[in-house]
Amino acid sequence: MTDQNRLARQVAALADAHVLVVGDLMLDRFVLGSVDRISPEAPIPVFQIKNQRPMPGGASNVATNVVALGGTATLIGVTGDDEAGQVLTSLLGDQPRLVARTVVDATRPTSVKTRYVAQGQQVLRVDSEQRHAIGADVTAQLLQMIDAALPEVGALVLSDYGKGVLTPDVLRRIIDKAAARNISVVVDPYGRDFARYKQAGYI
């Protein structure tokens, strides 16, 4: 069997798959416009906004990709108690075959990456986020949601962007819970310390 045939069969199998995605939720904002002059105030381009488009990012994007390939996704993560979190939740609610279960943490903002694009090129990216580890109460709520979701799924994807949700303790406990149920674990890793993902099936 060729690699292309094997990939085609794996993609087709996603039509019957229910995947749990856990990780760092983000809102991607794309600000589309044009640059046709330099500011008289400083040697910087003047960006003229024409359109803006929000999209699910981070682990949220992984879950929407699972759905796009024909699967069913349950997404678990953390948002802030803010407008960006509400926008992201609304976007995810519009996705068929995707259930988003989020813990709202009032102590941190929803991670937002805003990209300014002109003439097909990124001009600037602005990040609004905090990267500290989630607290004990949020961790407990997160693990409770994961416990409830694991019996329903056939695979687990850990989407780690280093934003403080998948702490070493959370990773260890999630991977152990999945292993106890013989659930395949796939990791989209952050950094080079792959020991954090010990016992995961695929990194």
Predicted features by range, described:
Residues 1-36, 51-203:
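Ribokinase/PfkB-type carbohydrate-kinase core domain
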Residues 43, 47-50:
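Divalent-cation-assisted or electrostatically stabilized phosphate/pyrophosphate-binding catalytic cores
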